Amino acid sequence: MADLIRSSLKVTALPAYLLACMALLLAVPARAQWSGSVDLSGGLGGIEGGIASDNKPVFHGLAQGEFRLNYKTDKFSWNTTLNGKWEPNTTDNTRISYKKERLGIIYKSASTRPLTVSLKSEFAWKPAADRNYSSWILYQYKNDRGQNHSLNYDGKENDSEKLSYNYEVPVLNEHKVETGLKTYRSFDSGRSILQSSLTFQAINSKKVTTWIVFKSENNKEGSGTAIDVDDLKGYAWKYRITPNSLDLNLDGDIHLQRTVLDDATKLKYAPGFRFSSKHALDENSGATRINVTLEDVEEAWRDSTRLRESFNYLSILAEPYLTADFKWNKLEAHLDYACQLYARRLNDETHRQPLKIKGVYPVGKSNIKWTISPRHSLNLTNQLSVAHPDYLKICWYDRTAGYLDQLYRGNEQLLSPFTQRSGLEYELTLNRFSARTSVTYTHVSNEIDQTWTNEEIDGRQYKVFHWMNSSNSDALGITQKLGWKGKVITANVAITYNQTRRASTRTDAVKNSIDWRLNADITARLGRGWSIGSDLKYQSKMKTFYTVLSEYGELNAQIQKDFKKFSLYLRGRHLLDQTVTTSFESEELQEYWVEEVRNNRRIVMIGVKWKF
C-alpha cells in the first residue's frame, strides 16, 4: 500500500514525518474512509518589472507552492499542509545633479530574497453534534539574506571632494513553533456558544517572543490573556460575559518596560470596565453602552541630568453610547451616537499639573433610507464628530519655578476637530442594469492653537489652557456608478470627483486639491469554469498649496503637484483558482515651485502573474 501511495504522489522519497503519518492511516479500522484527497498546488506567482524616468528599475517576483494531505472519518479529521514562498525584490535609485561646477551622485540599491517554509498539522475530533475538539501544531522557518548598496559623491565643495560607499548584508533567520487546543460547545440549539482555546507560540530570531493566550467565547464574544517576554514585558487579561441582552466586560493590562541605556523603568497598570445592554421593540431595536476605563500609570527613570524621580497618574474615560434601528413602512433609520468624557489626574509635585479634563460632544452617524419602489431608493447619511471647544488643563503654578512656562508651552499639540459629513444617494435598479448617484459634503475644523490665562482660585495661582480653531476644510464629492449584469458579460463603470479646500487661520496657508478617478471592469464567461476580463483604472490629482504673509498680504510661496496614474489589467480565471494576469501600469508626478519644475518623474511597470 505504501508503494502505491508513493507511486501515485510521484515522489522518490518522503520525510519520516509523512511516512509515520501514512503508517498511522494504514492502521485505522477498515470502516474509516478517505474523504478528501492529496492536493498539490502552486506555481510561479508572478514577475513584475519596470523602469522610471529617473533611472530607478524595480523588480518584484513571487514563487509559491503548497502541498495538502487530508484525511477524514465520521468523528475524526486530519489535515497537513506544507507551504513554501520565495519573494525576491530589487529596488535601485540613482540621482545625478550638476550645479555651478559641482557634481553630485547618489546611488542606492536594495534587494531582499525572503524565503518562508511552513508545515502545519490540524487534528479535529467531534464526539457529538454540539461538541468538538481540535488541536494543531505549526512549524515555520523564515530566511532573508538581502543586500544594501549606497554610493554618495559630492564634488568641489570648498575645493574638496567627498566620496562614501556603504555595503550591508542584513540577515534574518527565524524559527517559529506554535501549538494549541480548541474546544467548542453549543447549548439550547446553538443560541449559546462556549468556545475556549489555549495557544503557545515561540519565535527564535534576533528577538525572542513567547506568549500564551487563553480565549473564551460566548455568543462570538472573545477574551484572552497574553504574556509577552521581550525587551517589553506585559500581561493582559480580559473576561467577558455576554448573555442575549447584557454585555459585561472586565479587562486589564500590566506593562513593565526596562530600558538599559538610560536606566529607565516604566510600569503601567490599566484595569477597565465596560457595560452594555440591548433591547428589542417589535421591528425597532436599540442599545445602550457605557464604557468606563480606569488607568493607573507609574513611571520612574534616571538620566544624566537629574536624580531618580517617579510619578503616577489616574485616567478615567467614560463613553456612553446610544444605538437604535427603526423601520416604518418604506422608511428605515439607524442611529449610532456616543459621548466621551475624559479626566486625568497626575500625582506629581515636580511637574505641577494635577488635573486635566476633556469633554467630547456627541460623536456618531445616522442613516435614513427611503425605498420608493423596488427599483428606486433614496439614502440620506450624516456623520457628526464634535470635540469640546475648550480643552481645559488646570496646573498649579509656583512663582519660584519659572521654568514651568517654557516646559508647558512646548509640551503638547492637541487636535480637537469638528467634522460634519452629509450625503445623499439615489439608486436605480432595473432587470440587468443598475445606477447609483451620490453627493457628499464634508466640513472639518481643527483646533490646534493654544492660549494661556492666569487665574487665582482659592488663593492659588493656576494656568488655564484654551485651544482655538486654526484650520478648516471643505470637500465636495460626486460619484456615478453604472452596472450591467448579463448572462455572459458583466460590466461596471465608476466615475468619482472630489474637490477639497483647506485653509489655516494661523498661517494663512491654503491648499486646494482636485481628484477624479475612473474605474471600469468587464468580465465575459466562456463556460466550463473559465472567464476572461479586463480592469481599467485612471486617476488624476492636482494639489496647489500657497501661503500668504499676514503682515504684507503678498504671496510667499506656491507649490503645485500634478499626479496621474493609469493601470490596465487583462486576466483569465478558472473556478478552480487558476488565474493568469498581465498588467501595464504608468505613473507620473510633476511638481512645480513657483513656476519652476522641481520634480518630473514617470514610472512604467509591466508584469505577468499566474497561479494554479
Q: Where in the sequence are the language-model features?
A:
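C-terminal extracellular loops and terminal segments
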Residues: S77-W78, M468-T479, T490-N556
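Face-selective signature of the C-terminal outer-membrane beta-barrel domain
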Residues: A124-L138, P170-D348, K365, T371-N379, ...
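Membrane-proximal, glycine/serine-rich, low-complexity loop/turn segments characteristic
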Residues: I5, A30-K206, H255-P271, D325, ...
